Amino acid sequence: AGSEEYFMNLLADAMEPLLLANGIQFVRNDPQGTVGNSIRQSNADSYDFHLALHSNASGSGSEGQNRGIIVFYYPGSVSGQRAAELFASALREIYPLPDRVTTRSAENLTELRRTKAPAVLLELGYHDNAADAMWVQEHIGLIAQTLVQALTEYFGLPYVCPGPSQTGLAVTDSGGPVNLRSYPSAQGQVIVQIPNGSTVTVFGRYRGWYVVLYGDALGYANSAFIQL
């Protein structure tokens, strides 16, 4: 047994290596903080997306009687609605009652109303329903993978299965820098140039590209210029 907070943090823990392997940088909220703290943290920088992980609770008198997943977005947010529909579509593939995975707009949820970035709030089943609670507990890894796959689709990235992280060196024959790009393509935007001989961390591979962390910059580098 455990609290909603406990299992949602386990889920976030499981998502971390998948996000890194897919070139998606992230910041997590303080588990001890309030919703207000999470909103302020989200608005303190120029983030591309805000994802809130929750489980639902039935109203008084109907505890344990409800099941289902609700994906909330703020009304009028085109990006938020698009993300919500991607999450819902992916979750229908793994939730035992796919017809009970729905999207819904909501004006009254502060994590949607007050965040600057497009936002989605996930209610992953009802924690007062034994079957829903057990489904979450027994499928943390699968749920994490499903959510990250939806995020890669949202960001237009290929999904990469994570391997063990490895230390590598950025090396070019010319001695010039290695471009770290936002997408695994020579047309991808250059995020930063990695000086020749620099140490990097490699989290995954997609075709001829490695997912690389250099300093605090995460992106894709041509595997020809990374020695493991």
Walk through the language-model features, giving the residues of each.
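SH3/SH3-like beta-barrel fold
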Residues: 197, 210-214
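Active-site-adjacent mobile loop/cap segments within catalytic or ligand-binding domains
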Residues: 2, 50-55, 59, 103-162
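Extracellular/periplasmic catalytic domains that process cell-envelope and extracellular macromolecules
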Residues: 43-45, 63-65, 112-116, 194, ...
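Active-site-adjacent substrate-binding region
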Residues: 78-103
